[in-house]
From Swiss-Prot:
This is Exosome complex component Rrp41. Disulfide bonds: none annotated. The lineage of its organism: Archaea, Methanobacteriati, Methanobacteriota, Archaeoglobi, Archaeoglobales. Keywords: Cytoplasm, Exonuclease, Exosome, Hydrolase, Nuclease. Component of the archaeal exosome complex. Forms a hexameric ring-like arrangement composed of 3 Rrp41-Rrp42 heterodimers. The hexameric ring associates with a trimer of Rrp4 and/or Csl4 subunits. Catalytic component of the exosome, which is a complex involved in RNA degradation. Has 3'->5' exoribonuclease activity. Can also synthesize heteromeric RNA-tails. It comes from Archaeoglobus fulgidus (strain ATCC 49558 / DSM 4304 / JCM 9628 / NBRC 100126 / VC-16).
Length: 258
């Protein structure tokens, strides 16, 4: 069960949040690429208490054929929460929230994947929430982005996602569950980042209320967090490439010794 079952008296005490973070700090993040052998690309990611896994298949032929687009690949994205991912057991299958998250996430990736290189094909992205906490959609977007790179899918850059919330009147980066449940606002972002620079906003949603100035501040706070996450995504991919290189060296050395 959650440590906080009822609304806490305060969400920020002496400048610190309930989990000890400052307003501009991310939750702990762990990223591991290429965790599923049968997928073309995959990623396991932890973001706070969120635990998610993403798998990419394709580009591959579309069935049935009448769904094919002769000019470009179609992108299919499925966000799903495992029945055991939340404290109260969830019914299997997609609900309205999962369908909505799948739709906006697909649109974010459609803007960055070079679809025109793969006409009449499909790129399928499956993300499964194994353990849910605040910000599961942002965690899944980050995992899916790494999985796409792992699959070798050409993109204009990385999709990197983080949310900004408002708790006790203070903007906070990467809200925890209590801030998400009892705060005044929640604003998930996804950015297109290329070569360490933010190119554009690929996704922006809003739940709650912020002033115009707060929205501007939230965008800057989200950019700061996204660039940190981008470096973690990049490091996870580089680690995987190094592992592949070492495996190839071992195979080559073994062949020479034979």
């Amino acid at each position: 069960m959650s440590e906080f079952n009822e609304k806490p008296e305060k969400l920020i005490v002496d400048g610190l949040r309930l989990d000890g973070r400052k307003f501009d700090e991310l939750r702990p993040i762990k990223i591991e690429a290429s965790v599923l052998k049968r997928a073309d690309g995959s990623c396991y990611l932890e973001m706070g208490k969120n635990k998610v896994i993403a798998a990419v298949f394709g580009p591959r032929e579309v069935h049935p054929r009448h769904l094919q687009d002769p000019s470009k690949a179609i992108i299919r994205y499925r966000y799903n929460m495992a029945p055991f991912s939340v404290e109260e057991r969830k019914r299997p299958g997609p609900d309205r929230r999962s369908i909505e998250i799948s739709k906006v996430s697909k649109e974010a990736f459609e803007a960055v994947i070079m679809k025109e290189l793969f006409p009449r094909s499909a790129i399928d992205i499956f993300v499964e929430v194994l353990q849910a906490d605040a910000g599961s959609r942002t965690a899944c977007l980050n995992a899916a982005s790494v999985a796409l790179v792992d699959a070798g899918v050409p993109m204009k850059g990385m999709i990197t996602s983080v949310a900004v919330g408002k708790a006790d009147g203070q903007l906070v980066l990467d809200p925890m569950k209590e801030e998400d449940n009892f705060g005044e606002a929640d604003m998930p972002f996804a950015f297109l980042i290329r070569n360490g620079k933010i190119e554009s906003i690929a996704l922006l949603q809003m739940d709650g209320r912020m002033t115009r100035d707060e929205v501007k501040q939230a965008i800057e706070l989200a950019k700061k967090g996204a660039l940190q996450i981008y470096e973690m995504q990049r490091e996870a991919i580089l680690r995987r490439y190094i592992e592949v290189g070492e495996e190839m060296d071992e195979i080559t050395e073994g062949g020479e010794d034979a």
